[in-house]
């Protein structure tokens, strides 16, 4: 029996990396009976006679996290790709995804693409927004000139000893960026649907690729995103700046809405917390309160 990590899943097969070798495997039949699905990123115990013959996954080891969209396990960090235009830059969509990452204890990074398609004035506006995200704990990359050796190196420097996924809105340029990081990847790039101002999905499967002493994955994009893995009560803890400043609120359980002597609301008024972050927070709370619980029917 050996241990390794699933780096690719395709058509019922799972490629497992173990000691720098790749083994093709299938999941044992009892996984289906136990309603367990192996995920890319899973650490597994498996058996295989050789690299040329299919082996079997025997057990999935405990996951430290599991992304639903995309379905990947044991992720250390996620580079969220946002475009300046086509599709349009959206703070709301960025906040939704960062909230999701916070809920899974995944470090979020933000990379801005298509800056060559906007004016200097628009670039400075977006850059000011992203500077705020950098300040509250999300490393950001917003190059005025795309794909310079310096910016590619800066991204690569985050890879060692980590499993990283690249994700973001469809058509924002995830695969294009990865192609510049390593041209051998030759990943398909997206075309933009002009009528919807959204991209066409091009990444068909999920794969982790060894890059710069780490594993990197390009994942299928999304054109919209609900609020995942959070409730109206836990939402407040998904904002790192709220967690820090909220310690000075009068009430320990302050939700920063109607409560008196709220340090977060005071920080918004003082310009210490970006207004859009708080506005989106209130919107997300309202959306979550409208979600009705789904109850399983009794047999």
Swiss-Prot record:
Gene3D superfamilies: Nucleic acid-binding proteins, P-loop containing nucleotide triphosphate hydrolases, Probable gtpase engc, domain 3. Pfam families: RsgA_GTPase (PF03193), RsgA_N (PF16745). PROSITE patterns: ENGC_GTPASE, G_CP. One of its GO terms (cellular component) is cytoplasm. It is an enzyme of class 3 (hydrolase). GTP binds at residues 113-116, 168-176. Zn(2+) binds at residues 249, 254, 256, 262. Keywords: Cytoplasm, GTP-binding, Hydrolase, Metal-binding, Nucleotide-binding, Ribosome biogenesis, RNA-binding, rRNA-binding, Zinc. Binds 1 zinc ion per subunit. Residues 64-225 form the CP-type G domain. Transmembrane segments: none annotated. InterPro entries: G_CP_dom (IPR030378), NA-bd_OB-fold (IPR012340), P-loop_NTPase (IPR027417), Ribosome_biogen_GTPase_RsgA (IPR004881), RsgA_GTPase_dom (IPR010914), RsgA_N (IPR031944). It is found in: Cytoplasm. One of its GO terms (molecular function) is metal ion binding. Its EC number is 3.6.1.-. Its main location: cytoplasm. Its cofactor is Zn(2+). PANTHER family: SMALL RIBOSOMAL SUBUNIT BIOGENESIS GTPASE RSGA (PTHR32120), SMALL RIBOSOMAL SUBUNIT BIOGENESIS GTPASE RSGA 1, MITOCHONDRIAL-RELATED (PTHR32120:SF11). HAMAP family: GTPase_RsgA. One of several proteins that assist in the late maturation steps of the functional core of the 30S ribosomal subunit. Helps release RbfA from mature subunits. May play a role in the assembly of ribosomal proteins into the subunit. Circularly permuted GTPase that catalyzes slow GTP hydrolysis, GTPase activity is stimulated by the 30S ribosomal subunit. Belongs to the TRAFAC class YlqF/YawG GTPase family. RsgA subfamily. Monomer. Associates with 30S ribosomal subunit, binds 16S rRNA. This is Small ribosomal subunit biogenesis GTPase RsgA. It comes from Latilactobacillus sakei subsp. sakei (strain 23K).
């Amino acid at each position: 029996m050996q241990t390794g990590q699933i780096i690719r899943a395709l058509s019922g097969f799972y490629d497992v990396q173990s000691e720098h070798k790749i083994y093709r495997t299938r999941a044992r039949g009892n996984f289906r009976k136990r309603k367990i699905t192996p995920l890319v990123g899973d650490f597994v115990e498996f058996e295989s006679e050789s690299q040329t013959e299919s082996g079997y996954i025997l057990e999935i080891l405990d996951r430290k996290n599991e992304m639903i969209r995309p379905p990947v396990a044991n992720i250390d960090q996620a580079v969220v790709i946002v475009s300046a235009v086509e599709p349009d830059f959206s703070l709301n969509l960025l906040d939704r995804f960062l909230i999701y990452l916070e809920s899974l204890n995944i470090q979020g990074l933000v990379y801005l693409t298509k800056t060559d398609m906007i004016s200097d004035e628009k670039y400075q506006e977006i850059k000011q927004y992203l500077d705020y995200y950098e300040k509250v704990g999300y490393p950001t990359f917003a190059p005025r000139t795309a794909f310079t050796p310096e910016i590619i190196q800066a991204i690569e420097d985050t890879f060692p000893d980590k499993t990283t996924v690249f994700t973001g809105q469809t058509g924002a340029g995830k695969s294009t960026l990865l192609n510049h990081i390593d041209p051998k990847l030759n990943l398909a790039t997206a075309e933009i649907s002009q009528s919807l101002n959204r991209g066409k999905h091009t990444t068909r499967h999920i794969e982790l690729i060894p890059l710069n002493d780490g594993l990197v994955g390009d994942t299928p994009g999304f054109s919209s995103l609900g609020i995942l893995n959070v409730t109206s009560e836990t939402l407040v803890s998904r904002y790192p700046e709220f967690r820090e400043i909220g310690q000075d609120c009068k009430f320990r359980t302050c939700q920063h809405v109607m409560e008196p002597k709220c340090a977060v609301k005071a920080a918004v008024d003082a310009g210490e917390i970006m207004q859009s972050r708080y506005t989106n927070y209130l919107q997300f709370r309202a959306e979550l309160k409208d979600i009705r619980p789904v109850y399983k029917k009794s047999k």
